[in-house]
Amino acid sequence: MTQVAKKILVTCALPYANGSIHLGHMLEHIQADVWVRYQRMRGHEVNFICADDAHGTPIMLKAQQLGITPEQMIGEMSQEHQTDFAGFNISYDNYHSTHSEENRQLSELIYSRLKENGFIKNRTISQLYDPEKGMFLPDRFVKGTCPKCKSPDQYGDNCEVCGATYSPTELIEPKSVVSGATPVMRDSEHFFFDLPSFSEMLQAWTRSGALQEQVANKMQEWFESGLQQWDISRDAPYFGFEIPNAPGKYFYVWLDAPIGYMGSFKNLCDKRGDSVSFDEYWKKDSTAELYHFIGKDIVYFHSLFWPAMLEGSNFRKPTNLFVHGYVTVNGAKMSKSRGTFIKASTWLNHFDADSLRYYYTAKLSSRIDDIDLNLEDFVQRVNADIVNKVVNLASRNAGFINKRFDGVLASELADPQLYKTFTDAAEVIGEAWESREFGKAVREIMALADLANRYVDEQAPWVVAKQEGRDADLQAICSMGINLFRVLMTYLKPVLPKLTERAEAFLNTELTWDGIQQPLLGHKVNPFKALYNRIDMKQVEALVEASKEEVKAAAAPVTGPLADDPIQETITFDDFAKVDLRVALIENAEFVEGSDKLLRLTLDLGGEKRNVFSGIRSAYPDPQALIGRHTIMVANLAPRKMRFGISEGMVMAAGPGGKDIFLLSPDAGAKPGHQVK
């Protein structure tokens, strides 16, 4: 089916320029690259861009620690990031930086338009100030107790337990992450973006189909709780762009970071000497399509602030946000101590890029689900699918064609109906690539690979080759197998760029989507060379060990949980005695509708029942498994009203968060209501 060529601009979230690219980052860049490569195969005009997010307090402070300038640090990180992405064959048309003249000009332009249109408000605020470092503390540089659910060790912008958002000044017992000092309050004039003015527009945009259902539902929660004005300024010292006519005030990193998409595209247009395309893609009534691939952790900024900023400054809004989940390794959060926090560069020292591209692709869908990289399953799947099913199909047939027929394929198809079955699948597979149902596309392709190998097994060319007078049959069978291999590799071309190059060299032709409608007949192929090597668990073991060694080399004197979560200040025995810890029996456990973090627990204290909301859902995806288990709870914690009901206590758990949360249990014999002493 002939498609009308579209103009498409695709972006990935901008990696922060203070650390290396790891396998968590690579999920998004691989997902976007597969989609982009498919769009290009279908004849669409695609501009695929990215940049480093190069501003903010963390970069300023890390550069100070390294004894270099922020500019030097972000320059080195940019080179490292680009090398990693090139190693994974991410086909960016441009990779830039938010610390660029294009981004400065666009940030100032958008800010000036927002101000002219009345969407920038000035007001004096009280904020936390580190007296030891002599600096105001951004929200992520303050930790304390959540003012909503009272969970300790939460950042100054949102609680990872209950999901509440708040200002750093609302934290209970705040501490500076920079120095550990107790902050003091100081007044400062700040600039705010009037986000509530865009509530009606954002709600209409949410319902327009521009967002996945899960994202739209989450946005509805934010609308119900009310949108707040957004502080877009930061005080010196700060590494970023100074706000025009406001000495000592800088744009908050999240203002100029998404503008970095525009800055990178502007840089690309300038490199091409193209003064038209930028406006063509970004003007208010643009007919070009704009897609952002992002992780679920930055949905808030991309689904609320970014479209509102664009609307208020007379630019177009995104066509769609494509949101994905996190990466776990072997069923758990990536861990430096276990060697599963794997950098992109470390991976490439042990495996090729196509292997990870294939594994991620086989697991991805259009939903916001986390992806688990199970390293044993990875080895089995790559060997079973790429080596045994696809590459082996070519190797089983190529030898006979090269040796017996001088590399020339038969002039007719041995089984036209089977070939039609393969080409007819283009519509289903293409739709799966288009809709980002990548796992479905891979399943369809592997089902075809099974059919192709079954055909070869049934025709047994190795037997035919020994029978006199059957040369024509042998050529026809092997040519059929090679033609089926060609179709499979065409469907896999968006996923496996390096294997595709080797396949095209063997087939002596470029693989194109429409080209499969015409089989290779009477065509000369090149001598067959090994296309792909099997992988084994020894490589995995070496990869994990190398990742551990990298951590050891970079480790500070303090390692383990205490490094990230130091012991709190000493308290008196009288303070501790105020906490009444009791054994409780979990009578019921269930999901909380409207929350992806909480479970509702019904607890028996041996004489009364308690209803407790606990942020442990990520570690206990099957709440029924908790029923009948004993745990420890804080029984005298004041009840707190939540959106879902009243929580009458807190259960005790350990761990860094995510899937690594471990509910505490007493020894056998403890009864509900027993006091923990």
Curated annotation (Swiss-Prot):
Pfam families: Anticodon_3, tRNA-synt_1g, tRNA_bind
Catalytic reaction list: tRNA(Met) + L-methionine + ATP = L-methionyl-tRNA(Met) + AMP + diphosphate
Span of domain tRNA-binding: 575-677
Cofactor binding comment, as recorded: Binds 1 zinc ion per subunit.
Residues the record lists as binding Zn(2+): C146, C149, C159, C162
EC numbers on record: 6.1.1.10
Taxonomy, superkingdom: Bacteria
EC class of the enzyme, as a word: ligase
Major site of localization recorded for this protein: cytoplasm
UniProt motif 'KMSKS' region: location: 333-337
Listed cofactors: Zn(2+)
GO biological process terms, semicolon-separated: methionyl-tRNA aminoacylation
Origin species: Escherichia coli O139:H28 (strain E24377A / ETEC)
One MF annotation (Gene Ontology) recorded for this entry: ATP binding
Any one GO cellular component localisation term in the record: cytosol
Family stated for the protein in its record: Belongs to the class-I aminoacyl-tRNA synthetase family. MetG type 1 subfamily.
Keywords per UniProt: Aminoacyl-tRNA synthetase, ATP-binding, Cytoplasm, Ligase, Metal-binding, Nucleotide-binding, Protein biosynthesis, RNA-binding, tRNA-binding, Zinc
Record protein name field: Methionine--tRNA ligase
Role description: Is required not only for elongation of protein synthesis but also for the initiation of all mRNA translation through initiator tRNA(fMet) aminoacylation.
PANTHER family, alphabetized: METHIONINE--TRNA LIGASE, METHIONINE--TRNA LIGASE, CYTOPLASMIC
Zinc found in the keyword field: yes
Record: residues binding ATP: K336
Motif mapping: 'HIGH' region: 15-25
